Curated annotation (Swiss-Prot):
Identification of the protein by name: Pyridoxal 5'-phosphate synthase subunit PdxS
Pathway(s) this gene product operates in, as recorded in its UniProt entry: Cofactor biosynthesis; pyridoxal 5'-phosphate biosynthesis
Family: Belongs to the PdxS/SNZ family.
Record keywords: Lyase, Pyridoxal phosphate, Schiff base
Single GO MF annotation: pyridoxal 5'-phosphate synthase (glutamine hydrolysing) activity
InterPro entries the UniProt entry points to: Aldolase_TIM, PdxS/SNZ, PdxS/SNZ_N, RibuloseP-bd_barrel
Native organism: Actinobacillus pleuropneumoniae serotype 5b (strain L20)
Pfam families hit by this protein: SOR_SNZ (PF01680)
Transmembrane spans: none
Record's keyword annotation contains Flavoprotein: no
One GO-annotated biological process of the protein: amino acid metabolic process
Length: 295
């Protein structure tokens, strides 16, 4: 039974159910209820949103299990939680708690700088970040059921998420248009499993959903990522660090769903109050860029 529950087909199917939606970071039950009422398809339970993690510095770990439990009991939508890259026990604890997804996340301080989790060993589905197709396929090869761009979390600056999504999509088009005898060389170049390149060639797309994340702060940002081909969006600090979280949450959900209705997005963007304060990426030292974590 465990093997059936944890099969790739089941786990990827669960992720497909979130397609077209918004997943919001929350730090308590009240925020989780706001997210659910706004139309979020899932919430990510954590102790601090990425902008606060960035500001605090030091080591960022898995959220206190009491916070995760509080969020799980507050909402009926799926609940995700973050584990550190390579931290087997954090992931096993979250799996034992019954979370719906685990995010092996670069937002937290990596526990292992050499090895990511072997996600196929778990019954719970995983979401992982990527900056390019090589990273995406390595994570899928380890068992990830869902991808997201890394972007640059906690900045309110969407430029890195745009860069990562455009790069993945450009590399996908290249693979899809290759002849079969070129795929092995491309697999070597990407550092990715050959079998996954064959899947992409056959399917004409990634075998899992790919959401946008990292720096999304406004309804227009969310719509932009959908316009560029994202399957949905994660919003971290952008909602609950804004002036009016309830309005921002509802507006971002609507903009994600109706991303080509520009008149609607204009109306949604009126009277929202101030968005979260943004950071210029070029002003961040390389060691402060969360997207650099993992490989």
């Amino acid at each position: 039974m465990t093997k059936i529950l944890g099969s790739d087909l089941i786990k990827r199917g669960m992720a497909q159910m979130q397609k077209g939606g918004v997943i919001m970071d929350v730090v308590n039950a009240e925020q989780a209820r706001i997210a659910e009422a706004a139309g979020a398809v899932a919430v990510m339970a954590l102790e601090r949103v990425p902008s606060d993690i960035r500001a605090a510095g030091g080591v960022a770990r898995m959220a206190n299990t009491a916070i995760v439990r509080e969020v799980m009991e507050a909402v009926s939508i799926p609940v995700m939680a973050k584990a550190r890259i390579g931290h087997i026990v954090e992931a096993r604890v979250l799996e034992a708690m019954g979370v719906d997804y685990i995010d092996e996340s670069e937002v937290l301080t990596p526990a292992d700088e050499e090895f990511h989790l072997l996600k196929s060993d778990y019954t719970v589905p995983f979401v992982c970040g990527c900056r390019d197709l090589g990273e995406a396929l390595r994570r899928i090869g380890e068992g990830a059921s869902m991808l997201r761009t890394k972007g640059e979390p906690g900045t309110g600056n969407v430029v890195e998420a745009v860069r990562h999504l455009r790069k993945v999509n450009a590399q996908l088009r290249k693979v899809i248009n290759m002849s079969h005898d070129e795929l092995m060389t491309e697999a070597k170049h990407l550092g990715a499993p050959f079998e996954l390149l064959l899947q992409i060639k056959t399917l004409g797309k990634l075998p899992v959903v790919n959401f946008a994340a990292g720096g999304i702060a406004t309804p227009a940002d969310a719509a932009l990522m959908m316009e560029l081909g994202a399957d949905g969006v994660f919003v971290g600090s952008g909602i609950f660090k804004s002036e009016n979280p309830e309005k921002f949450a509802k507006a971002i959900v609507q903009a994600t769903t109706h991303y080509q209705d520009y008149d609607l997005i204009a109306r949604l963007s009126a009277d929202l109050g101030e968005p979260m304060r943004g950071l210029e990426i070029s002003e961040l030292a390389v060691q402060d860029r969360m997207q650099e974590r993992g490989w």
